[in-house]
């Protein structure tokens, strides 16, 4: 894959899927400087990895992007307190930007604790990026360099737990899977304003950020939230320098949305 298409418009969410970056605007057809920065981050990252990009959108939006490029400062624009591109979350109606998180199933979370690091898929699984790209579970057809990074979602987002369920089931989860049959993963929370200073952090326009190769937990993590049903299996794997970061939380929630809100609100206490 050496070409990426950027479609800016009205979509359910912003996502990159099979070579297309669907960029949803919070107030279409108006585009904010933050949203323009996302688009330019995506173009920069893709071009650095040998892929050209083309934007498909209204002429007025293209003009605003060009105008921004002419007046762009050297300083990055900080995210708004809440990003309203995705309003699927029933409680927040958007993405809260104080925290980011990485979510893992129990077995992977134990390996993370044993190593003391979040690791990219290439390192964690001991496969090449090309091998990971060619796996059937790469449903989005992500390019191989994507697998050299650890990916993060906004702190109140349910996407990580949804992916955990998808991996568990071997298919896309349905409403029942995300409701009464939902089993949450372990969440590793980080302060966004701190993690952006990681020397290997990258902005690629789709995610809040991603980090290449590894993140040493003792240096960066703010809290690790574990469903309390995993406590007995999990606690023997916690290194001494992370014991104060680990918290157990009961999943007494009706669905993935309620759990995402509960765990995010709990994690905010440890910022």
Give the ranges of each region predicted by the language model.
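NAD-dependent ADP-ribosyltransferases
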Residues: 1-271
């Amino acid at each position: 894959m050496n070409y990426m298409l950027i479609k800016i418009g009205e979509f359910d969410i912003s996502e990159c899927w099979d070579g297309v970056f669907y960029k949803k605007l919070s107030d279409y057809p108006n585009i904010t400087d933050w949203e323009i920065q996302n688009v330019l981050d995506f173009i920069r990252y893709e071009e650095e990895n040998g892929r050209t990009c083309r934007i498909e959108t209204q002429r007025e939006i293209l003009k605003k992007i060009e105008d921004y490029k002419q007046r762009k400062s050297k300083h990055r624009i900080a995210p708004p307190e809440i990003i309203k591109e995705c309003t699927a979350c029933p409680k927040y109606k958007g993405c809260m930007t104080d925290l980011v998180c990485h979510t893992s199933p129990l077995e992977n979370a134990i390996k993370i604790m044993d190593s003391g690091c979040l690791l990219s898929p290439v390192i964690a699984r001991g496969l090449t990026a090309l091998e990971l790209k060619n796996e059937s579970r790469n449903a989005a057809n992500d390019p191989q360099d994507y697998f050299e990074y650890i990916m993060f979602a906004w702190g109140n987002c349910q996407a990580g737990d949804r992916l955990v369920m998808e991996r568990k089931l071997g298919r896309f989860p349905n409403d029942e899977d995300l409701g009464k049959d939902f089993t949450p993963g372990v969440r590793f929370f980080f302060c966004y304003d701190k993690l952006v200073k990681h020397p290997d952090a990258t902005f690629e326009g789709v995610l809040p950020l991603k980090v290449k190769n590894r993140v040493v937990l003792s240096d960066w993590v703010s809290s690790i939230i574990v469903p309390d049903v995993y406590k007995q299996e999990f606690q023997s794997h916690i290194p001494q320098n992370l014991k104060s970061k680990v918290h157990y939380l009961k999943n007494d929630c009706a669905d993935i949305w309620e759990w995402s809100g509960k765990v995010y609100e709990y994690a905010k206490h440890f910022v």
